């Protein structure tokens, strides 16, 4: 039997927390949390800035007690702020991330990494360093090369090294990929190391598969035109069937992307559900 025969043929992705909201009874915050469901497993990708994702999940009739894995994209507080609340709620899930996620992080002078990271029970964590198949059809990409230096988003961010701060190049960042064996979808929370760099890395792993969905934040809401143009130009020759933007992409850049690529581009607001296929 081909191992790809075990890959899920259906994925459901629900945005539990994001900057915007339209659904009645839901709330928004500056952060991101995605719920991913296959016929056999349930995952969480980031926890937003607070426990809001838990409250929104309840409104959406999603039981987070059943989540098998929590994948953390990087250490910023708007993606890990609900970590403590999740670990209290769910006693069984394994947390998967890079070990450098616990490094102290800053935006300018303000600390914005994992809150009270020293109090977290790391026995529940699984640290990854290289491409990893977490579950059949679900891959982690923690090794993102900086092939396009223009499409990087490090400005104003720092990380603590020994006793001093240095510019943060986001060694802790990781992307999540879902595949059914014939097409792949990329979930990237903030893309500090560049969404086009992430795509190139995933393309190396799945060179013959179709590019089904690109979902997440591109960190271009305040970016200069050169950075936006670098991404748009890349999509001209390698564009997924659907681009679901959110969070740090910015509504203005969402509108610009839609001008370029039309109905392929949608906004991934709080409460939105995307199904694959």
What label would you give each PLM region?
Residues 17-20, 47-50, 75, 100-101, ...:
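Active-site metal-binding loops of divalent metal-dependent hydrolases
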Residues 100-174, 266-277:
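Metallo-beta-lactamase
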Residues 42-45, 64-67, 79, 104-129, ...:
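Conserved N-terminal glycine/acidic-rich loop preference
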Residues 52-101, 204-213, 239:
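Active-site metal-binding motif and surrounding structural segment of the metallo-beta-lactamase
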Residues 5-24, 155-167, 216-220:
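Glycine-rich phosphate-binding "P-loop"
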Residues 76-79, 167-185, 190-270:
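Cap/insert and terminal regions of metallo-dependent hydrolase folds
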Residues 11-14, 42-43, 69, 93-94, ...:
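Structural motif
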Residues 9-60, 169, 173-188:
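Conserved beta-strand hairpin/beta-sheet module of binuclear metal-dependent hydrolase folds
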